[in-house]
Amino acid sequence: MDNHQLANVIPASEYGRILASGHPIMDVRAPIEFTKGAFPASSNHPLMRDDERQQVGTCYKEHGQDAAIALGHSLVCGAVKQQRVDAWLAYLDAHPDAYLYCFRGGLRSQLTQQWLAEAGRDVPYIQGGYKAMRQYLIDTIDRAPEARPMLILSGITGSGKTDFLLQRQEAVDLEGLAHHRGSSFGRYHEGQPTQINFENSLGVALLKHQQSPARILLLEDESYLIGRSALPKAFYMGMQAASVVILEEPLEARLTRLLDEYVHKMHRGYVERLGEEAGFEAFAEYLANSISGIKKRLGGKQHDELQQMITDALAVQTQRGDTQAHLEWIALLLSKYYDPMYQYQIGKKADRVIFQGDHQAMHQWLDEYATR
């Protein structure tokens, strides 16, 4: 590689800027690598397909680096090579300031850079590649409890914690990153990210937060698991030691909010994805499965009662287009399950609570607290 290419490398000191700014990255790893984990602003344009990468990897183990490189060149040559380069050029036309990387910032990055240079495009590659950048994000997450004081927003189910968080610059929305609302009814239509992608998104969100004027890190009160997304241990332990504020909301407002979240939004989302009939069936299945997921904690009798109430409410919705009947089972679910569970959990944190109030009072208190 010539001196020009050596100079055209983005150093590790730039990781924070690249990730926090959402700078476009052309990821030339194989699709299987990208699927396991990637960064929010990256796009997969592989040098080798999965099968080609596997062949080269086997050759490397059995015959060494030189033989593996030779095999790689024989697999990606001629028309195949031109197709790959054309795909890269199309991406770079749309993202002319993009960087590129492979897993370690090694041979694949260098070869891609060389082929692009031969095609007249000068594209820097990132030192250390995906592996080093991911480690940078893991370190960012682990150091977050010391980077800025954490403050935990708690509140009974339906109190509007997520809506509140989204109005605050001090906040990072963990449930949004996990694509899950953190309860039995918390599933999103599009499903959850892989654990690695959840961690990558969390790391990027924390980098953005640390580069903002915010003096505290406001987080919703979460368990270790948000759906199937696990909070990294050091980060979760920091949350467990942080001060707590409690968001209060009257029962009627909570019921209205949960009717909108559990019924209106979920029904609308399924219908938009699957059509009217299949969408309604998927929505009904979502409600039934959500109750079944907490059957052991509800007890058989309570579970069966709630399932029947849901069935009745769905029948009314089908016949008259009226969703108000759903309020009955939501109210019972709150009184028999969510509210007692919340009281038990918040009782264990009583010594960490430093404020409680409604949405307006909480905003006013935070405005003052965040500038201390």
From Swiss-Prot:
Q: Does the keyword Transferase apply?
A: yes
Q: So what does this thing catalyse?
A: 5-methylaminomethyl-2-thiouridine(34) in tRNA + selenophosphate + (2E)-geranyl diphosphate + H2O + H(+) = 5-methylaminomethyl-2-selenouridine(34) in tRNA + (2E)-thiogeraniol + phosphate + diphosphate; 5-methylaminomethyl-2-thiouridine(34) in tRNA + (2E)-geranyl diphosphate = 5-methylaminomethyl-S-(2E)-geranyl-thiouridine(34) in tRNA + diphosphate; 5-methylaminomethyl-S-(2E)-geranyl-thiouridine(34) in tRNA + selenophosphate + H(+) = 5-methylaminomethyl-2-(Se-phospho)selenouridine(34) in tRNA + (2E)-thiogeraniol; 5-methylaminomethyl-2-(Se-phospho)selenouridine(34) in tRNA + H2O = 5-methylaminomethyl-2-selenouridine(34) in tRNA + phosphate
* GO BP annotations listed: tRNA wobble uridine modification
| UniProt keyword terms in alphabetical order | Selenium, Transferase
Give the Gene Ontology MF terms in alphabetical order: transferase activity, transferring alkyl or aryl (other than methyl) groups; tRNA 2-selenouridine synthase activity
- Output the InterPro entries linked to this UniProt entry: Rhodanese-like_dom, Rhodanese-like_dom_sf, SelU
Q: What is its EC number?
A: 2.9.1.3
Q: Which residues form the active site?
A: 102 (s-selanylcysteine intermediate)
Which stretches make up the Rhodanese domain? Answer: 19-142
**What general EC class does the enzyme of this chain belong to?**
transferase
The answer on whether this UniProt entry bears the keyword DNA-binding reads: no
Tell me the subunit arrangement: Monomer.
- What function does the entry list? Involved in the post-transcriptional modification of the uridine at the wobble position (U34) of tRNA(Lys), tRNA(Glu) and tRNA(Gln). Catalyzes the conversion of 2-thiouridine (S2U-RNA) to 2-selenouridine (Se2U-RNA). Acts in a two-step process involving geranylation of 2-thiouridine (S2U) to S-geranyl-2-thiouridine (geS2U) and subsequent selenation of the latter derivative to 2-selenouridine (Se2U) in the tRNA chain.
The family this protein is said to belong to: Belongs to the SelU family.
Annotated HAMAP family: tRNA_sel_U_synth (MF_01622)
Q: What is this protein called?
A: tRNA 2-selenouridine synthase
Q: Which organism is it from?
A: Shewanella loihica (strain ATCC BAA-1088 / PV-4)
User: Lineage of this protein's species?
Assistant: Bacteria, Pseudomonadati, Pseudomonadota, Gammaproteobacteria, Alteromonadales
